[in-house]
A protein has these predicted regions:
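Surface-exposed, low-hydrophobicity beta-strand/loop segments enriched in small/polar/acidic residues
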Residues: 1-93
Length: 93
């Protein structure tokens, strides 16, 4: 991965992130002050393979770092669930 340009994309709702095929290297998640924050990412669409599914604490900013080569999204990162989350920033190559 040396020499790859890291790109960032910020989302605040469900649906395609419009990044295209990519490797997810890191996620920055800001959760709401109440509720049960949950983030679920699938490949391409809501019916695509689940690639990342995490529960988070309320009122925090969390960084999720993916080891090695990252998570490959063949089609696009699809934000399936963003319950009680203010924003999500994807770091991709």
């Amino acid at each position: 991965m040396a020499g790859s340009d890291v790109k960032t994309t910020r989302v605040t709702a469900t649906g395609a992130a419009s990044i295209g095929r990519c490797r997810l290297m890191q996620v920055l998640v800001t959760s709401a002050g109440s509720g049960t924050p949950e983030l679920k990412l699938t490949d391409g669409s809501n019916s695509g393979e689940t690639k990342l599914h995490v529960d988070l604490q309320t009122g925090e900013t969390d960084t999720i770092s993916v080891p090695a080569q990252g998570i490959l999204f063949e089609t696009d990162i699809n934000v399936h669930t963003v319950d009680d989350i203010t924003s999500v920033v994807f770091f991709t190559v």
